Amino acid sequence: MPDGIVASEAKDNTNNNLVHSFLGPKFPAASESSIMWFILRCLEWTLAKLLYRRRGYDHDLFYKGLAFGKYPNPTFTVTSPDCGPTGAKLGVEYSQWGSGKVPQLTWPVSGIEVKEYLIISEDPDAPLGHSNVHGIYCFVPGNKTGFGPDDLELLGEDKNGLKQISSGYLVGKNRRNTVYIAPRPPLGHGPHRYFFEIVALSQPLDPEKLSPVPTKQELSDMIIGKVCGWGLWTATFEQKWSM
């Protein structure tokens, strides 16, 4: 075998051993594409460490808005049959490294008359300078006591970005213009917290006054005087080198 080919194979084996020793046996055999992927991961980790203190934008969470003046704390308990009580650690299947499904959530039948619910998911630890919206869902019937993946199947989308989903809920705006953004915190940025806020409304939202894809701020203003309670479920997820 020519010396050049032998040297090239030896270099590939060295790279392969280096990558495997750092990332573990799950990492694929070294190649130009895998080495480039590894370099990009290192750059992501470095940037995340530089931005590590950019987190904790809890003041920007939806329930910190003026509409919650009478109810600064949750009034009912939300839990997840799949993941457990609030504060759970999300499995990989709930992230962008897995199927990216939303956790199944449940809450008790309300003791007061709820016209409808508004559901918002957000991450206050994203290094964006504000809480990052992952999902907004309007017009959830007041007799509902659960929410999950089956509600969010995308059936279609028009030219204005209006999405039709299996539940019939109106989908609000997130930064990717999708039905839901599954967790994918930057590698090296540590655990991120994900807040799922279930807001009970004493009056229904007026669809004539909502934009086709309502924003968090738009809804925050619209529900002033309509909040009659709310529940909160949180979870954490951290991206690992081995993912």
Curated annotation (Swiss-Prot):
Gene: tstB
SUPFAM superfamilies: PEBP-like (SSF49777)
Organism field: Talaromyces stipitatus (strain ATCC 10500 / CBS 375.48 / QM 6759 / NRRL 1006)
Matches recorded under CDD domains: PEBP
Protein name (database record): Phomoidride biosynthesis cluster protein B
Biotechnology note: Phomoidrides A and B (also known as CP-225,917 and CP-263,114) are potent inhibitors of Ras farnesyltransferase and squalene synthase. CP-225,917 and CP-263,114 inhibit Ras farnesyl transferase from rat brain with IC(50) values of 6 uM and 20 uoM, respectively. CP-225,917 inhibits squalene synthase with an IC(50) value of 43 uM and CP-263,114 with an IC(50) of 160 uM.
Organism lineage: Eukaryota, Fungi, Dikarya, Ascomycota, Pezizomycotina
Stated role: Phosphatidylethanolamine-binding protein; part of the gene cluster that mediates the biosynthesis of the antihypercholesterolemic agents phomoidrides which are dimeric anhydrides. Within the pathway, tstB is not essential for dimerization and its function has still to be determined. The pathway begins with the highly reducing polyketide synthase tstA that catalyzes the formation of a C12-fatty acyl-ACP, starting from one acetate and 5 malonate units. The hydrolase tstM is involved in the release of the C12-fatty acyl chain from phiA.
UniProt record similarity statement: Belongs to the tstB family.
